Amino acid sequence: VAIGETADAVAAGDERCCGYLYHKIFTPVTVDQLVKDGEKFSLLGVEIEAMHLPGHSMGCTAFLFEWTGKKLVISGDVIGTLLVGDFGWDGSIDFDKKIYTESLRRFAKVDSDIMLPGHGMIYFHKPRRRVEQALNAALMQWR
């Protein structure tokens, strides 16, 4: 399951795929299911909403769903949780500060109980505060 920009990157297997950062070849693959921003799909009986949040890379997407009465968000690489003030890595080939900042603004409006990032610690307490911290750090660093 992927948004169009990610599907294009993994189908091409080009420098947008992180294997190149480690001098590895990325074997191209075809995405089974394309989704668009705001689209809902079902996986194992769970309804999941895709939220396209480009900037870190043009295909960054968060996935929102409910599980046992809790609102969860899989944020992937949209936000890092390794360090306070750290808002994620800005070194990808298609990174864009302006677009990323707008995505953080949009993501800061999402209310969830648990955030599962691509890197760092899972947030069990007010994940939106972490997103707001990241947005503030980005705004301060890039003004």
Question: Language-model features: where?
Answer:
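Active-site HxH/HxHxD metal-binding segment of metal-dependent hydrolases
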Residues: 1-40
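Metallo-beta-lactamase
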Residues: 30, 40, 47-128, 137-138
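Short, acidic/turn-prone active-site loops that include or flank metal/cofactor-
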Residues: 5-8, 78-79, 140
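Short, hinge-like loop/turn segments at secondary-structure boundaries
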Residues: 17-22, 93, 133-135
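Charged, glycine-enriched surface loops/patches
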Residues: 131-143
